[in-house]
Design a protein with these regions (language model features):
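Long, charged amphipathic helices and adjacent flexible linkers at domain junctions
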Residues: 9-29
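A C-terminal functional module that forms or caps the active site or interfaces directly
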Residues: 23-134, 138
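Internal gly/pro-rich beta-alpha loop/helix module
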Residues: 1-8
Length: 138
């Protein structure tokens, strides 16, 4: 995978087996992963619909999403964790750790996480979220 003139390993988003040799330590272990089961919903035209479908199917869930999308997601406000503004990837990246740690305190069985576009800083954000969700991605 190429990002400008930089080539990323094809294993960047691949699940790594525990006994597999990796290119860097950050590829093998979970970092900032909550105990709460998580699903990451990739950025797409139908992202909000997918999130709302998951909310309907799961009574005890919460959503980590973007400020401007909160009004479109059918979940009580006390079950919504604001990651920041969709167009402010720096804000989102600085909120990931605290947002993931809030999940376990909320007592939800499932966390549905709104993903960002996989380019620029968004690539790094998605890599972190994919690993936090243990590769459970829609």
């Amino acid at each position: 995978m190429w990002f400008g003139k930089v080539r990323f390993s094809d294993k960047l988003f691949a699940k790594v087996k525990i006994d597999e040799m990796v290119e860097s330590p950050g590829m093998k272990y979970k970092h900032y992963a909550p105990k709460t089961r998580c699903i990451l919903v990739k950025s797409a035209e139908n992202q909000i619909r997918k999130i709302n479908d998951l909310v309907l199917q799961n009574n005890n869930c919460c959503v980590l999403g973007f400020l401007e999308d909160e009004k479109y997601i059918n979940i009580p406000s006390n079950r919504f964790i604001n990651l920041g503004r969709k167009n402010n990837l720096k804000e989102i990246s600085s909120n990931i750790f605290s947002s993931l740690t809030k999940l376990d305190k909320m007592g939800c069985e499932l966390a549905i996480i709104e993903g960002v576009e996989e380019s620029g800083l968004g690539l790094s954000i998605m890599n972190r979220l994919v690993r936090a969700c243990e590769y459970n991605v829609m």
